[in-house]
Design a protein with these regions (language model features):
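Conserved alpha/beta catalytic core and glycan-binding cleft of carbohydrate-active enzymes
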Residues: 1-114, 142, 152, 156-159, ...
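Carbohydrate-interacting/catalytic domains
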Residues: 81-82, 94-101, 107-256
């Protein structure tokens, strides 16, 4: 059966350079389509970066559009950007929905659209750093309740930059992305996600052009905002620091 691209965009080879780094388009598009779904449906919708009908996401990071029959399989592996791939995985694991990894994405499998996207799993030749990054992001997703059932709020966006929050019942996760080739200083109005006006945020994950880290770092919140310096093609995931308090009866409680 021949399905026209207008019906199934996954089969399209369209190249839209005008949308590269267009955060306005991303925010408006996501808001538009998410508004058509009820919350229970959104929470179980599969968040996929790749599938059997589309080119592999890692291949899409090289901005080469085409088919394996014309370009050859090697072209799908040239000029790929693992930092952009990690950005995408971070969004996949922190967005509303059920993160769904197409086999091999976690191992660095490349490929143009079907049939090239169905390459075999690279046993013994996996990109181990990418595999470990997926494991870390899965741990964060499983550990942080707002990432599973929390609300979503866009906090700030501009060309190549996006910050959003997942939050519920006094818990917040803040995600910041810089998808540009430049260093960026980003001011985030975290108060909009019910983060206290003054306090601290702790880093859970930071990925940049060279690698990633889960080492803890602290960011100050002043007047409901926090300022972060973002590297090239980077993503930062953080949450408020909860200070333990002891009441007059010796009972501990946490607060931001």
């Amino acid at each position: 059966v021949c399905i026209p691209p207008q019906v199934c965009p996954a089969l399209s080879d369209e190249r839209r350079t005008d949308l590269w780094g267009n955060a306005d388009n991303f925010v408006n598009t996501m808001n538009h389509f998410m508004a058509s779904m009820l919350t229970p449906s959104l929470q179980v919708a599969m968040n996929e970066l790749s599938n059997h009908d589309h080119s592999r996401f890692l291949t899409r990071t090289n901005h080469i559009v085409g088919r394996v029959a014309q370009l050859g399989s090697k072209a799908a592996e040239e000029g790929i950007n693992l930092a952009v791939m990690r950005e995408a995985v971070a969004v996949q694991m922190t967005w509303v929905g059920a993160p769904t990894v197409y086999y091999g994405d976690e191992a660095g499998v490349c490929g143009f659209t079907d049939p090239d996207s169905r390459r075999t799993y690279p046993w013994g030749q996996e990109n181990r750093e990418l595999v470990e990054f997926h494991k870390e992001m899965i741990r964060i997703h499983k550990r942080e309740k707002p990432l599973r059932t929390g609300s979503l709020k866009m906090l700030s966006w501009s060309s190549n930059v996006l910050a959003y929050a997942r939050f519920q019942e006094g818990e917040q996760i803040i995600v910041v992305l810089n998808n540009s080739k430049e260093l960026k200083e980003v001011t985030i109005p975290v108060w909009q996600a019910e983060v206290p006006m003054k306090g601290k945020m702790e880093r859970l994950m930071y990925s940049w052009e060279k690698s990633y880290t889960t080492e803890r770092d602290i960011y100050l919140v002043e007047d409901g905002e926090t300022v972060v310096n973002m590297g090239k093609h980077s993503v930062l995931i953080m949450k408020p620091v909860r200070e333990m308090q002891v009441d007059e009866y010796g009972k501990e409680s946490s607060s931001n």
